[in-house]
Amino acid sequence: MTEYKKVIAQNKKALFHYFIEERLEAGIVLKGSEVRSLRQGKASIEESHAADTGHEVFLYNCHIAEYEKANRFNHATRRPRKLLLHTKEIKKIIGRIRIKGYTLVALSMYFNKKNKVKVELGIAKGKKLHDKRESIKEKDWKRDQSRLIRQK
């Protein structure tokens, strides 16, 4: 059974810059003007990452544009946003990202079937330059293979 997801924003660079070892879903605490702006698709999570502050996890550098029709009650575009996770999940995440070289990266932001905003997070390890070159070579080779198959 496939889940309904209306994708708002994706972080395509994360798949190039990191090895994604584990994926998880988290809710996010938002203000009303932020939700309205997300419904218009005005969000970017290209540079966003998550970090722990004690017993909580926050999403940093997530840009949600201001909602034009909200007057003085508008939100700050790049404020830290709290992620909603179970305590066991938070402890597991903190244990994993405290290891050197690991980070918590936002992969996508979407509305689920109940119209709640969710963030897909990935526990990731950074790629070295030669790893990035290898992934480019693999992608080019797959593209060439598909061209050769189509020509036959």
From Swiss-Prot:
Main location: cytoplasm
SUPFAM superfamilies in the cross-refs: Small protein B (SmpB)
Cited InterPro entries: SmpB, SsrA-bd_prot
A GO-annotated cellular component: cytosol
Keyword terms of this UniProt record: Cytoplasm, RNA-binding
Protein name per UniProt: SsrA-binding protein
CDD domains reported for this sequence: SmpB
Subcellular localization, as worded in the UniProt entry: Cytoplasm
Job description of the protein: Required for rescue of stalled ribosomes mediated by trans-translation. Binds to transfer-messenger RNA (tmRNA), required for stable association of tmRNA with ribosomes. tmRNA and SmpB together mimic tRNA shape, replacing the anticodon stem-loop with SmpB. tmRNA is encoded by the ssrA gene; the 2 termini fold to resemble tRNA(Ala) and it encodes a 'tag peptide', a short internal open reading frame. During trans-translation Ala-aminoacylated tmRNA acts like a tRNA, entering the A-site of stalled ribosomes, displacing the stalled mRNA.
Source species of the chain: Rickettsia rickettsii (strain Sheila Smith)
A Pfam family of this chain: SmpB
